Amino acid sequence: MRYESLIFDIDGTLWDSRQLVAEGYNIQLAKEGLSHLAVNAELFRPLFGKVMTEIADVIFSSVPAPERYELMKRCMDEENRYMHNNECNIGYPGVRETLKKLSEKHRLFIVSNSQQGYPELCMEKLGISPYIQGHLCFGDTGTTKGQTIRTLMEKYNITDCAYIGDTQGDYEATLEAGVPFLWAAYGFGTPAGYDARIDQFSDLLNL
Protein backbone atom coordinates (compact mmCIF):
# COMPACT_ATOMS: atom_id res chain seq x y z
CA MET A 1 0.00 0.00 0.00
CA ARG A 2 1.43 3.35 -1.03
CA TYR A 3 0.08 5.51 1.83
CA GLU A 4 2.53 6.49 4.56
CA SER A 5 -0.21 6.69 7.19
CA LEU A 6 -3.62 5.05 7.64
CA ILE A 7 -6.42 6.57 9.71
CA PHE A 8 -9.23 4.31 10.93
CA ASP A 9 -12.85 4.79 11.89
CA ILE A 10 -14.03 2.61 14.79
CA ASP A 11 -17.66 1.45 14.54
CA GLY A 12 -18.31 -0.64 11.46
CA THR A 13 -14.59 -0.66 10.67
CA LEU A 14 -12.64 -2.06 13.64
CA TRP A 15 -15.55 -3.55 15.59
CA ASP A 16 -19.33 -3.92 15.84
CA SER A 17 -20.27 -2.64 19.28
CA ARG A 18 -23.99 -2.11 18.66
CA GLN A 19 -25.28 -4.81 20.99
CA LEU A 20 -23.07 -3.80 23.91
CA VAL A 21 -23.82 -0.10 23.36
CA ALA A 22 -27.56 -0.81 23.44
CA GLU A 23 -27.22 -2.92 26.59
CA GLY A 24 -25.18 -0.20 28.29
CA TYR A 25 -27.72 2.47 27.39
CA ASN A 26 -30.61 0.34 28.65
CA ILE A 27 -28.90 -0.21 31.99
CA GLN A 28 -28.73 3.55 32.50
CA LEU A 29 -32.28 4.11 31.26
CA ALA A 30 -33.56 1.48 33.69
CA LYS A 31 -31.68 3.15 36.55
CA GLU A 32 -33.49 6.40 35.75
CA GLY A 33 -36.92 4.82 35.37
CA LEU A 34 -36.86 5.45 31.63
CA SER A 35 -37.12 1.89 30.33
CA HIS A 36 -39.81 3.05 27.92
CA LEU A 37 -36.96 4.72 26.01
CA ALA A 38 -35.05 1.43 25.67
CA VAL A 39 -32.95 1.02 22.53
CA ASN A 40 -31.81 -1.98 20.50
CA ALA A 41 -28.75 -2.81 18.44
CA GLU A 42 -30.42 -2.38 15.06
CA LEU A 43 -31.48 1.16 15.94
CA PHE A 44 -27.82 2.17 15.94
CA ARG A 45 -26.98 0.85 12.45
CA PRO A 46 -27.85 4.08 10.57
CA LEU A 47 -26.70 6.26 13.48
CA PHE A 48 -23.14 5.10 14.09
CA GLY A 49 -20.77 7.60 12.58
CA LYS A 50 -22.91 10.58 13.53
CA VAL A 51 -21.94 12.88 16.40
CA MET A 52 -23.50 12.30 19.81
CA THR A 53 -25.96 15.20 19.63
CA GLU A 54 -27.33 13.93 16.31
CA ILE A 55 -27.79 10.44 17.75
CA ALA A 56 -29.55 11.88 20.81
CA ASP A 57 -31.91 13.85 18.57
CA VAL A 58 -33.07 10.56 17.06
CA ILE A 59 -33.20 8.09 19.94
CA PHE A 60 -34.32 10.57 22.61
CA SER A 61 -36.47 12.82 20.45
CA SER A 62 -39.28 12.73 23.03
CA VAL A 63 -36.98 14.23 25.67
CA PRO A 64 -36.72 18.04 25.50
CA ALA A 65 -33.37 19.63 24.74
CA PRO A 66 -31.01 20.17 26.49
CA GLU A 67 -32.12 17.37 28.85
CA ARG A 68 -31.77 14.80 26.05
CA TYR A 69 -28.08 15.62 25.66
CA GLU A 70 -27.50 15.30 29.40
CA LEU A 71 -29.29 11.94 29.30
CA MET A 72 -27.15 10.93 26.33
CA LYS A 73 -23.99 11.79 28.28
CA ARG A 74 -25.08 9.61 31.21
CA CYS A 75 -25.92 6.73 28.87
CA MET A 76 -22.53 7.00 27.18
CA ASP A 77 -20.75 7.00 30.52
CA GLU A 78 -22.61 3.82 31.51
CA GLU A 79 -21.92 2.35 28.06
CA ASN A 80 -18.18 2.87 28.52
CA ARG A 81 -18.26 1.23 31.96
CA TYR A 82 -20.31 -1.68 30.69
CA MET A 83 -18.15 -2.27 27.63
CA HIS A 84 -14.95 -1.99 29.66
CA ASN A 85 -16.11 -4.80 31.96
CA ASN A 86 -17.62 -7.00 29.23
CA GLU A 87 -15.32 -9.65 27.79
CA CYS A 88 -17.37 -10.24 24.64
CA ASN A 89 -15.18 -10.15 21.52
CA ILE A 90 -16.73 -7.57 19.19
CA GLY A 91 -13.74 -6.93 16.94
CA TYR A 92 -13.97 -7.87 13.29
CA PRO A 93 -11.90 -10.92 12.31
CA GLY A 94 -8.22 -10.26 11.77
CA VAL A 95 -8.12 -6.68 13.07
CA ARG A 96 -5.30 -7.10 15.57
CA GLU A 97 -3.15 -9.27 13.32
CA THR A 98 -3.66 -6.98 10.33
CA LEU A 99 -2.86 -3.82 12.27
CA LYS A 100 0.27 -5.43 13.68
CA LYS A 101 1.45 -6.23 10.15
CA LEU A 102 0.49 -2.80 8.78
CA SER A 103 2.31 -1.04 11.62
CA GLU A 104 5.60 -2.42 10.33
CA LYS A 105 5.39 -0.13 7.27
CA HIS A 106 2.77 2.51 8.08
CA ARG A 107 1.83 4.88 10.87
CA LEU A 108 -1.65 4.04 12.15
CA PHE A 109 -4.20 6.40 13.70
CA ILE A 110 -7.86 6.57 14.72
CA VAL A 111 -10.41 9.34 14.12
CA SER A 112 -13.96 8.82 15.38
CA ASN A 113 -17.11 10.88 15.90
CA SER A 114 -17.31 9.35 19.38
CA GLN A 115 -17.13 10.70 22.90
CA GLN A 116 -13.82 10.98 24.74
CA GLY A 117 -12.57 7.66 26.05
CA TYR A 118 -14.12 5.56 23.28
CA PRO A 119 -10.98 5.28 21.11
CA GLU A 120 -8.95 4.24 24.15
CA LEU A 121 -11.62 1.69 25.08
CA CYS A 122 -11.53 0.25 21.57
CA MET A 123 -7.74 0.02 21.54
CA GLU A 124 -7.66 -1.63 24.95
CA LYS A 125 -10.37 -4.19 24.23
CA LEU A 126 -8.95 -5.16 20.85
CA GLY A 127 -5.35 -5.21 22.08
CA ILE A 128 -4.21 -2.78 19.39
CA SER A 129 -2.75 0.03 21.51
CA PRO A 130 0.87 -0.84 20.57
CA TYR A 131 0.07 -0.25 16.89
CA ILE A 132 -1.87 3.05 17.09
CA GLN A 133 0.30 6.17 17.20
CA GLY A 134 -2.45 8.69 17.88
CA HIS A 135 -6.18 9.32 17.92
CA LEU A 136 -8.76 12.09 18.00
CA CYS A 137 -12.53 12.10 18.33
CA PHE A 138 -15.48 14.50 18.28
CA GLY A 139 -15.30 14.63 22.07
CA ASP A 140 -11.79 16.06 21.75
CA THR A 141 -12.36 18.58 18.97
CA GLY A 142 -16.08 19.35 18.76
CA THR A 143 -15.66 19.66 14.99
CA THR A 144 -16.78 17.73 11.93
CA LYS A 145 -15.03 14.45 11.27
CA GLY A 146 -13.36 15.95 8.20
CA GLN A 147 -11.90 18.75 10.29
CA THR A 148 -10.89 16.29 13.02
CA ILE A 149 -8.99 14.31 10.39
CA ARG A 150 -7.22 17.50 9.32
CA THR A 151 -6.41 18.35 12.94
CA LEU A 152 -4.88 14.91 13.46
CA MET A 153 -2.88 15.27 10.25
CA GLU A 154 -1.49 18.60 11.38
CA LYS A 155 -0.72 17.31 14.87
CA TYR A 156 1.27 14.33 13.60
CA ASN A 157 2.66 15.93 10.42
CA ILE A 158 0.79 13.51 8.16
CA THR A 159 1.04 14.39 4.48
CA ASP A 160 0.23 11.08 2.76
CA CYS A 161 -2.66 9.05 4.16
CA ALA A 162 -5.99 7.36 3.55
CA TYR A 163 -9.04 7.06 5.79
CA ILE A 164 -10.70 3.68 6.31
CA GLY A 165 -14.41 3.82 7.17
CA ASP A 166 -17.78 2.40 6.26
CA THR A 167 -20.48 5.07 5.98
CA GLN A 168 -21.56 7.93 3.77
CA GLY A 169 -20.55 10.24 6.60
CA ASP A 170 -17.04 8.80 6.50
CA TYR A 171 -16.88 9.34 2.75
CA GLU A 172 -18.03 12.95 3.12
CA ALA A 173 -15.42 13.48 5.84
CA THR A 174 -12.66 12.38 3.47
CA LEU A 175 -13.91 14.81 0.83
CA GLU A 176 -13.77 17.60 3.41
CA ALA A 177 -10.32 16.52 4.58
CA GLY A 178 -9.01 15.96 1.06
CA VAL A 179 -7.82 12.39 1.61
CA PRO A 180 -8.59 9.08 -0.16
CA PHE A 181 -11.40 6.90 1.22
CA LEU A 182 -11.03 3.14 1.65
CA TRP A 183 -14.49 1.64 2.12
CA ALA A 184 -15.00 -1.14 4.67
CA ALA A 185 -17.86 -2.81 2.78
CA TYR A 186 -18.56 -5.23 5.65
CA GLY A 187 -19.64 -2.32 7.88
CA PHE A 188 -22.86 -0.36 8.29
CA GLY A 189 -23.17 1.90 5.26
CA THR A 190 -23.10 2.29 1.49
CA PRO A 191 -21.22 5.45 0.52
CA ALA A 192 -21.69 7.30 -2.75
CA GLY A 193 -18.04 6.81 -3.65
CA TYR A 194 -14.70 5.35 -2.60
CA ASP A 195 -11.12 5.02 -3.79
CA ALA A 196 -10.74 1.36 -2.84
CA ARG A 197 -12.92 -1.30 -1.23
CA ILE A 198 -12.20 -4.00 1.33
CA ASP A 199 -14.63 -6.85 1.99
CA GLN A 200 -12.78 -8.02 5.09
CA PHE A 201 -10.28 -6.19 7.26
CA SER A 202 -7.30 -8.26 6.18
CA ASP A 203 -7.85 -7.11 2.58
CA LEU A 204 -5.87 -4.02 3.57
CA LEU A 205 -2.73 -6.13 3.32
CA ASN A 206 -3.40 -6.69 -0.38
CA LEU A 207 -3.98 -3.08 -1.48
Residue ranges of each PLM-predicted region?
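Conserved SAM-binding loop
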Residues: L14, G91, L108, Y163, ...
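Structured helix-beta-strand junction loops
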Residues: K50, E104-K105, T159
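Short, acidic loop-to-helix structural element flanking the phosphoryl-transfer center
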Residues: R81-I110, G146
